[in-house]
Amino acid sequence: MINVPSIESCDFHNKNVLLRVDFNVPIKNGRICDATRILRALPTIQYLANAGAKVIVISHFGRPKAKDSNLSLKNVVETLSRLLSKEVKFIDDCIGERVQRAINAMDGGDIILLENLRFYKEEEQNDSNFAKQLASLADIYINDAFSCSHRAHASISRITEFLPSYAGFCLQDELKYLEQAISFDAKPITAIVGGAKISTKIKMLIKLAEKVDYLILGGAIANNFLLFNKVNIGKSFFQNGVDDLLHDIVETANKNNCKIVVPEDVLVAVNSDYSTGVLRKIESILDGDIILDIGPQTLSTISGIIASSKTLLWNGPIGVFEHSAFANGTVEVMRVVSDLTHEGKLTSVIGGGDSLSAINTAGLADKDFTYISTGGGAFLSWLSGDEMPGLRSTLD
């Protein structure tokens, strides 16, 4: 197990604690569509407040080019206060004298939320001076943002040079469950990988092909494999110039007795009509077809594989679930995984690739799976074995 410096070993009474969370939540028409990342941060925030800390919460939000009211964390503070049943004060900056004055006025147990870190370009540049200014606000730094820990940013990586650093409860949970899943002790193990671009997942696919018993492919990634196997995919989305990568994955899978599973039948959109799915066998796809979901035979095959497995890792949707006509594959496989998890027959770890949205579409929740990772790119980096600057700096 990774040795994580736990916040439970520290005295926080009357200490200024800088807590890095990930409040990069989806917002539509001013309303938060999915508060999962906020909910995951609550245990750490509550623990620190109850321990008498002055809790200074920092996060990024979106990808602003400059200060933008639509990407202000002011949009989050009301929800955070409601979920904590406690007033959270918002400060519309994250460094400088106004922020320092607000912190000086805090009592133990108070919570403030600072403005979007990415309003300063120095955040993404991992700038030492910006990190030093953030660090000057506090006595202790806590990273509770696994989903950002693959990034070498000032508030994730550089800041740990200036403050004693600890891991929050959300980060600890992520590490525990992901490490448990990729230890590959409970076999057979199955991985489902979907999504659009295979090039962003090549290292993960090769690593999985070395370790898992079944590698189930969905989305445009499956289209690339079908094309590689000389199957006509019509007008379906695929990525050019990746045949060498596909060859490496297939070769790795063959060497390690990993079975790669691609669709046998699919639902397609005809003439770009996304309102209705037409069922096709793989060998019967027409030139104008766009593959957008798996068919019933493929669903049956995948369900059988999962039922025979002990561990499941899932990254990315199987179909274009945003269109109701093509959501069935993702939704039904989610339900199979959920049922087996509830029966105690399967350890299921899901993350990245719009997984939270897909889970909501299926009418399911956190409790229906062993663990749902908040990480997108971080989940990919972890499964790929990449170095994660935020973890290295926090855990060193």
UniProtKB/Swiss-Prot annotation:
Localization per Swiss-Prot or TrEMBL: Cytoplasm
Pathway stated in the Swiss-Prot or TrEMBL entry: Carbohydrate degradation; glycolysis; pyruvate from D-glyceraldehyde 3-phosphate: step 2/5
InterPro entries, alphabetized: Phosphoglycerate_kinase, Phosphoglycerate_kinase_CS, Phosphoglycerate_kinase_N, Phosphoglycerate_kinase_sf
Binding site for substrate: 22-24, 37, 60-63, 118, 151
Family matches, as Gene3D superfamilies: Phosphoglycerate kinase, N-terminal domain
One GO BP: gluconeogenesis
Sites where the protein binds ATP: 201, 322, 352-355
The protein's name: Phosphoglycerate kinase
Organism: Wolbachia pipientis subsp. Culex pipiens (strain wPip)
Lineage of source species: Bacteria, Pseudomonadati, Pseudomonadota, Alphaproteobacteria, Rickettsiales
Gene name of this polypeptide: pgk
